[in-house]
Amino acid sequence: MPDRSGSTTRFPISRRVFMAGSGAFLLLRPSSASRAADEKVTFIFIADVHACRMGAGLSPNCQQEGKTDANLLRHIRALNDLEYKHWPEVIDGNPTGLANAGKLIGRPRGVVVGGDMTDDGGGQTAERDEGTQILQFSHRYREGTGPDMVHVPVYSGLGNHDLDQDGRPPDTEWYRDELRDYVRFNHENSVFFKPPVPAANFDPLSDCYSWDWGPLHLVQLHRFGGDTRKGAVSALPWLKQDLATNAANGKPVVLFQHYGWDPFSTERWDPAKSTFDDTGHGKPHWWTQQEQQALLDTITGANVIGIFHGHEHDTPMIYRTGNIDLFKPIASFKGGFALAELEAKRFSVVLGQAFDEFGGVKFTNAFQKASS
């Protein structure tokens, strides 16, 4: 894989355990308000829900791929049950070494979605019945009560499957508009309307937004920071100003988007194989090296302690690009999630997967970095 900014780890770090060595810790520089800096922030990240309802049934191939409502309900039960579980002490027989190992996880601040809330924005079909997919998503991944809804606020994010669908002419934009309207309805403040999950800073041009949980600044970038596909407006000028305004003086920052720096997200056309893969040297499939570097340049100088992303469905990953740590759970319809906590200048992340119908989970990866 070509170098983008420093070195990029080609493959996910061990499925068992990754612990950042003390010499590689990224320092979380102290906040001016020590009390706020010591506040604990716990949150969940998910991606690739792929709500697949089509009218009264499912979109083609969704049943075979496991993109079913039953699997989403199993996922939601696992997310809701996490607050009653404990940070893992052992994964696959190996000690995690987490400083918070064995401690109760507690109630998370919210669930952040890293794109592909729906399935059929990726160009599969162009039917009005697709509108039931965002309806299905909203009935499941919205704060509510009972076993069939998430019990904490949900911060929505859009991926290629939400943004790439062209409707039949002349209504080519209807699907994208519907998904962007969902983000605005849920997160954009206005004089006339208070959204269910308000963002502190919402960019009306790109629909990217940011908010704070105590000592942590969080930013939703949808497909990726700087996306201009299908008429999108680049969020990079807004992001630069947002970080300067809200994350100065070393405040820790976490970014969320759909694409990452993993081999699938960075694959290119391979003419010898007539396909996109991670050994090709032709046209990039998802985003270009220039777009990747532009995002990295924009966040240079900010204390970005992690980027969470989705897009690839099957492999949990903890890896680096340059000096940035990246975290990618498996797809939500396969039960995947990331659980993160910032406490006392220590950042912990575990990846996991729902494995039964009763809220059970299996943790697959663990990561922690500390500061002085």
List where the protein language model places each region.
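Active-site neighborhood of phospho(di)ester-bond hydrolases with catalytic His/Asp-centered motifs
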Residues: 46-47, 111-116, 155-159, 255-258, ...
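Short, solvent-exposed loop/turn elements at domain surfaces
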Residues: 43, 51-57, 228-229, 264, ...
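Extended active-site neighborhood of metal-dependent phosphoesterases/phosphodiesterases
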Residues: 119-247, 278, 294-300, 317-349, ...
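Short, flexible/disordered intra-domain loops and linkers
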Residues: 56-68, 123-132, 167-174, 266-287
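His/acidic metal-ligating clusters that form di-metal
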Residues: 81-97, 103-107, 149-150, 205, ...
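N-terminal active-site segment of His-dependent metallophosphoesterases
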Residues: 36-127
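N-terminal secretory signal peptides
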Residues: 1-13
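N-terminal export leaders
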Residues: 13-27
